[in-house]
Amino acid sequence: MATAWAPDAGRTSWLLEVGPGLLGIAVAAAVHRRLPLSHWVHVCIFLHLLILIYGGYYTYALTPLGNWAKDAFGFARNHYDRIGHLALGVFPAFVIREVLLKKTALARDGWLYFLVLCVVLAVAAFWELLEWWVTLLVAGDVGQAFLGSQGDVWDAQWDMLLALLGAALVLPLFARAHDRSMARVPRRG
């Protein structure tokens, strides 16, 4: 929260970037008694929030880490935005997976994997629509900074693809670890 005091990007931009993560924490806290989440998911939420806070402090297009990579590897743009969208697939995938396993009769099979990927892609697409709406509604630089396309006409498509790939890659690799973490949480509701 200290990054909200005087973010380089300005408070409005910071709130737009970090607000959804803070809302996610509020929702997780509100439903904790009915739907206790695993330690794995809490770590995912924390790591995702760190990425959001860092990007929100500077704006994703101006993060020092992204600028360093841009200079070091000769990239045409700051790719921290891409890291953020990859994270939009990686970390929420486990939240979605856990909720589906706890609140539905889905088995741990291909349908679960497919549905988690569908929800991740839907969230990524909604985020792209949200970026567009904010650009239309919020004045000048803040709206453009939130959009973060950096002149790439395919930015929205890349962002959605990266979220989908992030989820598609981590789910098979870490599903068993996630299952072990869920097994240590009593099932309620």
What are these regions (language model features)?
Residues 2, 19-26, 43-54, 118, ...:
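Lipid-exposed faces of alpha-helical membrane segments in multi-pass integral membrane proteins
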Residues 23-32, 87-104, 136-142, 161-177:
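Membrane-interfacial alpha-helical segments at the cytosolic side of multi-pass membrane proteins
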Residues 7-14, 62-66, 80, 124-168:
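Interfacial helix-loop-helix junctions of multi-pass membrane proteins
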Residues 187-189:
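Short, intrinsically disordered terminal tails adjacent to the first/last structured region
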Residues 2-4, 71-72, 112-115, 128, ...:
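Short hydrophobic/aromatic segments of transmembrane alpha-helices and their interfaces
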